[in-house]
Amino acid sequence: MTKIIFMGTPDFSTTVLEMLIAEHDVIAVVTQPDRPVGRKRVMTPPPVKKVAMKYDLPVYQPEKLSGSEELEQLLQLDVDLIVTAAFGQLLPESLLALPNLGAINVHASLLPKYRGGAPIHQAIIDGEQETGITIMYMVKKLDAGNIISQQAIKIEENDNVGTMHDKLSVLGADLLKETLPSIIEGTNESVPQDDTQATFASNIRREDERISWNKPGRQVFNQIRGLSPWPVAYTTMDDTNLKIYDAELVETNKINEPGTIIETTKKAIIVATNDNEAVAIKDMQLAGKKRMLAANYLSGAQNTLVGKKLI
């Protein structure tokens, strides 16, 4: 069986790892260190570590792989192939050169579009109607290696980061399973990326999460679904942060300053943007409160909201 080192961290990576364990010989798993999570800051292992522990696989968790003791240990292994999926660190050249079959990455975009750490988020924020999975050889430069295989998938109007993450996780494992036999046999082809067509999807920053209502409704809507259910787009109402998990676009003839609540229904808070498409907030969370449907919030506040300004 092909001896594989797997490198990944979040839930996206676990589907790929489970497939590799079932089909090949995973001799080591490399992931990020445990991190404190929640208000009580409980040290929590990354999802990939949980899967590896279930199968009693050796786990390496370097804070930074380059120059680490873990890297030296990995370089001593007899390995055929390195597979990464959302690992979160660049690999040192010494490790890239270790396996005789090379190092490959499962990336959640149709490269060369959306190189970087947040390709699913950015594709939705940009209003793309499709994205996909790329299996590629790894090189020193970020997400720039030759493409081995790709498969596209449609982004539906009601998709958000959560739904596309789940679809792409399965697609990534399936495409890798289809692609690996030719890689192992040495019969696969690969195509260089056109660097002139490259776009980038950097990790989401806090400032990317704040909604600017002075934009077309479609852009605000895409931002909300492109950040849901994590890290979540937010605005401010009455000096209190308001996270918005779900919304929809509605046509309006009412002319109001962007960010103004122009109407409430039984199920939504409707907010003006800078065009004739308003945003209807359906699922929300005020700071310090539990997440709730707008319908539940409106049962006690419906008559007090119209005219308020979100900023």
Curated annotation (Swiss-Prot):
Keywords: Protein biosynthesis, Transferase. Disulfide bonds: none annotated. It catalyses: L-methionyl-tRNA(fMet) + (6R)-10-formyltetrahydrofolate = N-formyl-L-methionyl-tRNA(fMet) + (6S)-5,6,7,8-tetrahydrofolate + H(+). PANTHER family: METHIONYL-TRNA FORMYLTRANSFERASE, METHIONYL-TRNA FORMYLTRANSFERASE, MITOCHONDRIAL. This is Methionyl-tRNA formyltransferase. Attaches a formyl group to the free amino group of methionyl-tRNA(fMet). The formyl group appears to play a dual role in the initiator identity of N-formylmethionyl-tRNA by promoting its recognition by IF2 and preventing the misappropriation of this tRNA by the elongation apparatus. It comes from the Bacteria. The keyword Protein biosynthesis applies. InterPro entries: Fmt, Formyl_trans_C, Formyl_trans_C_sf, Formyl_transf_N, Formyl_transf_N_sf, Formyl_transferase-like_C_sf, GART_AS, Met-tRNA-FMT_C. GO terms for molecular function: methionyl-tRNA formyltransferase activity. It holds the Pfam family Formyl_trans_N. Belongs to the Fmt family. One of its GO terms (biological process) is conversion of methionyl-tRNA to N-formyl-methionyl-tRNA. HAMAP family: Formyl_trans.
